[in-house]
């Protein structure tokens, strides 16, 4: 930013806070400070006592300060640093127990300072230089606050927006409207990420908020159609769940990484086209109309510009946090029914108006007492799991879990979870594809867990220690290139729901330690993390499949049912001797 020479009619006002320390000697973390950047000079202009950046009153006070002291014909408000989607919001304050601004708090702050109007919104643009905030719910909240919104569906890399680029464009043409400014922000962001080598998974979009109302109507109608199908037959939840698992989702969404429960709206609707015969087309049309510009990396090619909530975690507490800010009543009742099996009084009244009375019970494989599912060996020696139609219809997804067995030392070393299975959903037949190979870094076997399964690529999470700190490597397998690539290292979602925006590129000389999970074979103890191999990153460090060598390996088929609960098959033991594989049930 400080590299841009601003004209006299462009002013940038900055408020600092929320950090225990800053990467400079200028900012005092003990209070909230305000700076003004004009021409080529950054000037300190004000300070106020320390307060949480996650409080609506703190934001409102800053907005009022700007409006009073620096009135302007055109105004943009930018939120910088950590975001975590619809449920947790933005601006996590590490001084005040990581308190964050929820969507309703953001709205209340704007409403206390400005006269809000969808026909004549007070702001030209609201931007989030933060992770995961390009959601339907965020856009709904801002519909009478600003003309345009700029935000990312995915976590942003640590380099963030390229302020030199878009502020430079604004300096050259201060008359530009919000759409043009948003486009400059997107293009310069992509340029900056390409410079830093962090562009593989980027997303950034410009939303015309004057066009958001038709999308909100279409989105709620989609929820009503989904709710009607679920009330008629809860098997809908498994069918919809399969579509969600195949859709581009953001921020991790695994037990190991944590959950944001955000999925691309367009990709979800496209993957659910066979389910939503009445409303899906309207959503896609309205979505295309309001997303006026976007950029995305090669491994975020399904990004449509806005995400929505889907309960990947299956956690009721996560949902309750979201429910108060969700843009659609219908989807709120849909997920409430899916997660709890019931609806509150308002929900019952809602579905009654739709013509539904008593809700059917949601079936669950985990609760029906069916136990482990038997396997057979086919003529080629592969393990086969055959499910009847009723059982297969309850499933959202099928995976396998793999572990190494050290019988002599009574150790079971968990290697991970993948979807490399021959799946015949129509006939309920699932066949293993064990080849005696697994993912490794420079020949060091890793724990790896699939986080996205697409037509063109899969994404994996690999827990490691990077220079002594816990991280997850983001690894992609590209089907066309037939190879793995390490995209970078990022920390998971923390206990406050805050995502990590720092995607770190591995550098020669970095120290990596692989993390696996181990238990005893004979006992019923839980898996605990263990450090296995420590090695140094080189210029030639690669992730690839490698032969695991001789030994015994245990595999289970994992079935995820429509309640997001997992049930497992009987185990199969693979014994590898001199490269030859023998299976035993």
Annotate each language-model stretch with its function.
Residues 2-71:
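N-terminal extension/subdomain marker
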Residues 7-12, 70-76, 119-125, 144-148:
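Loop/turn elements at helix/coil->beta-strand transitions in domains of secreted/extracellular proteins
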Residues 16-21, 83, 130-132, 154-156:
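Short beta-alpha junction loops
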Residues 24, 72, 83, 550-554, ...:
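Membrane helical hairpin/interfacial module
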Residues 51-121:
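Extracytoplasmic mature domains of secreted/periplasmic and thylakoid-lumen proteins
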Residues 90-128, 133-585:
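Terminal, contiguous helix-loop blocks that mediate binding/assembly
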């Amino acid at each position: 930013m400080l590299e841009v020479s601003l004209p006299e009619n462009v002013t940038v006002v900055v408020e600092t806070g929320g950090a225990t320390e800053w990467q400079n000697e200028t900012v005092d973390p003990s209070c909230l400070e305000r700076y003004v950047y004009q021409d080529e000079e950054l000037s300190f202009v004000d300070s106020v006592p320390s307060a949480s950046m996650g409080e609506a009153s703190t934001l409102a006070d800053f907005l009022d300060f700007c409006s009073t002291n620096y009135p302007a014909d055109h105004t943009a408000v930018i939120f910088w640093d950590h975001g975590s989607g619809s449920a947790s919001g933005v601006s996590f304050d590490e001084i005040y127990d990581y308190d964050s601004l929820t969507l309703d708090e953001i709205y209340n702050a704007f409403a206390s300072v400005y006269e809000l109007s969808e026909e004549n919104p007070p702001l030209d643009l609201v931007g989030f230089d933060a992770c995961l905030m390009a959601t339907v719910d965020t856009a709904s909240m801002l519909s009478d606050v600003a003309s345009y919104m700029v935000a990312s569906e995915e976590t942003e890399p640590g380099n963030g927006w390229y302020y030199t680029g878009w502020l430079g464009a604004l300096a050259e043409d201060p008359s530009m409207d919000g759409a043009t400014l948003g486009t400059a922000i997107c293009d310069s962001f992509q340029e900056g990420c390409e410079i830093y080598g962090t562009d593989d998974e980027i997303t950034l979009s410009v939303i015309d908020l004057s066009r958001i109302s038709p999308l909100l109507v279409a989105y709620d109608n989609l929820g009503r159609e989904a709710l009607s199908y679920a009330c008629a037959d809860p098997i809908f939840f498994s069918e919809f769940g399969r579509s969600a698992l195949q859709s581009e989702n953001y921020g991790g969404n695994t037990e190991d990484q944590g959950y944001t429960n955000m999925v691309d709206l367009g990709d979800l609707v496209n993957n659910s086209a066979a389910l939503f015969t009445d409303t899906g087309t309207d959503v896609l049309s309205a979505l295309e109309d309001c997303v006026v510009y976007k950029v995305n990396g090669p491994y975020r090619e399904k990004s449509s510009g806005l995400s929505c909530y889907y309960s990947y975690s299956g956690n009721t507490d996560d949902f309750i946090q979201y429910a108060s800010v969700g843009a659609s009543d219908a989807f709120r009742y849909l997920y409430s029914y899916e997660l709890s099996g019931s609806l509150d009084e308002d929900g019952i009244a809602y579905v009654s108006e739709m013509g539904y009375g008593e809700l059917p019970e949601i079936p669950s494989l985990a609760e029906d007492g069916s136990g482990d599912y038997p396997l057979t060996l086919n003529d080629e020696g592969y393990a086969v799991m055959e499910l009847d139609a009723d059982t297969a219809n309850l499933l959202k997804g099928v995976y396998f879990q793999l572990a190494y067995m050290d019988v002599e030392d009574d150790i079971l070393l968990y290697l991970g979870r993948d979807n490399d299975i021959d799946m015949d959903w129509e006939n309920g037949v699932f066949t293993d594809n064990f080849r005696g190979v697994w993912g490794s870094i420079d020949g060091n076997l890793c724990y790896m867990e699939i986080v996205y399964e697409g037509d063109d690529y899969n994404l994996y999470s690999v827990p490691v220690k990077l220079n002594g700190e816990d991280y997850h490597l983001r690894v992609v397998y590209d089907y066309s290139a037939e190879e793995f690539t390490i995209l970078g290292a990022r920390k998971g979602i923390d206990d406050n729901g805050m995502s990590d925006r720092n995607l770190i590129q591995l550098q020669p000389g970095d120290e990596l330690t692989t993390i696996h999970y181990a238990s005893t074979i004979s006992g019923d103890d839980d898996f605990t993390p263990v450090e296995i191999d420590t090695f140094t990153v080189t210029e030639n460090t690669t992730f690839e499949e490698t032969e695991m060598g001789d030994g015994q390996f245990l595999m289970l088929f994992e079935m995820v049912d429509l309640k997001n609960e997992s049930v497992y098959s009987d185990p199969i033991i693979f014994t590898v001797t001199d490269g030859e594989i023998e299976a035993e049930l």
